[in-house]
C-alpha cells in the first residue's frame, strides 16, 4: 500500500490568521506534519509527502503544485496498488487510529472530518477518484459506489479532527500528545472559555 500525506507548503492554514502570523502558521503546519509522520512511522508504513513546493524533510517528498484533486487523482490513476491518503493537519492522529483505518475492510475506506470533509482514506478500487470540494465525504461515498466499490467508514474522533480554524486549536491543546500541542503552548496559545465554549486566546 502506498501512503501519501499531502502538504501545502506555500501559504498553509490561512484561517488561523487571527491567532498565528504567516511565519507561525508555516512553522505550526510543519509541526503537525511531523506528528502525522511520527504516528505513521509507529504503524510501520513509509509515507511519501506530497508537497506543493520543495521542502527540506528527511522523508520521500514528491512536489506537485497542481490543485489537490488533480494531484491525488494523478496518483490514484497511476498506482497499481492500494493508496492511502492521510491529511497533514491531523494533529490528534494516533497509531491506533491509523491502524484501524488501514486494517478496515472495503474497496474504499473513508475517515470523515467533522465539517463534512474527508480527512483520510484507503482506496483499493482502481476507479476511485477524489473530489475535495464542499462536503467531500458525500461525494466520496457516491464516487466509490458509482464505481461499484464497497464503502467502509471509520468513526474516529482523532481522525475526524483536522486543524483549520482557531477553535480547532483548543482540541489540540485539550487532547494532543505530540509536538503540535507543545508548540502551541510554547507560542503562548492558551485555553479559555467564551460563551460557554472552550476556545483559545493569546494574551
UniProtKB/Swiss-Prot annotation:
Coiled-coil portions: none
Tree of life domain: Archaea
Pathway the protein acts in: Cofactor biosynthesis; coenzyme F420 biosynthesis
One family name in Pfam for this protein: CofC
Catalytic activity: (2S)-2-phospholactate + GTP + H(+) = (2S)-lactyl-2-diphospho-5'-guanosine + diphosphate
EC number: 2.7.7.68
Gene Ontology molecular function: GTP binding; phospholactate guanylyltransferase activity
GO biological process: F420-0 metabolic process
Keywords: GTP-binding, Nucleotide-binding, Nucleotidyltransferase, Transferase
Assembly description: Homodimer.
PANTHER family noted in UniProt: 2-PHOSPHO-L-LACTATE GUANYLYLTRANSFERASE (PTHR40392:SF1)
Role played: Guanylyltransferase that catalyzes the activation of (2S)-2-phospholactate (2-PL) as (2S)-lactyl-2-diphospho-5'-guanosine, via the condensation of 2-PL with GTP. It is involved in the biosynthesis of coenzyme F420, a hydride carrier cofactor.
Stated family: Belongs to the CofC family.
Name under which the protein is recorded: 2-phospho-L-lactate guanylyltransferase
Amino acid at each position: 500500500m502506498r501512503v501519501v500525506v499531502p502538504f501545502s507548503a506555500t501559504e498553509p492554514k490561512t484561517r488561523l490568521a487571527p491567532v498565528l502570523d504567516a511565519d507561525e502558521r508555516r512553522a505550526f503546519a510543519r509541526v503537525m506534519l511531523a506528528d502525522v509522520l511520527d504516528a505513521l512511522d509507529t504503524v510501520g508504513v513509509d509515507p511519501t509527502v506530497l508537497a506543493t513546493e520543495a521542502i527540506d524533510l528527511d522523508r520521500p517528498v514528491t512536489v506537485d503544485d497542481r490543485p489537490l484533486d488533480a494531484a491525488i487523482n494523478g496518483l490514484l490513476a497511476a498506482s497499481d496498488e492500494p493508496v492511502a491518503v492521510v491529511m497533514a493537519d491531523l494533529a490528534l492522529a494516533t497509531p491506533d487510529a491509523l491502524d484501524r483505518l488501514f486494517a478496515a475492510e472495503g474497496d474504499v475506506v473513508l475517515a470523515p472530518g467533522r465539517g463534512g470533509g474527508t480527512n483520510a482514506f484507503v482506496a483499493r478500487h482502481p476507479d476511485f477518484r477524489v473530489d475535495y470540494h464542499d462536503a467531500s465525504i458525500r461525494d466520496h461515498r457516491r464516487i466509490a459506489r458509482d464505481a461499484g466499490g464497497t464503502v467502509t467508514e471509520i468513526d474516529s474522533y482523532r481522525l475526524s479532527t483536522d486543524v483549520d480554524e482557531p477553535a480547532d486549536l483548543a482540541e489540540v491543546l485539550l487532547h494532543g500528545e505530540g509536538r503540535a500541542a507543545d508548540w502551541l503552548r510554547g507560542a503562548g496559545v492558551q485555553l479559555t472559555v467564551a460563551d460557554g465554549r472552550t476556545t483559545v486566546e493569546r494574551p
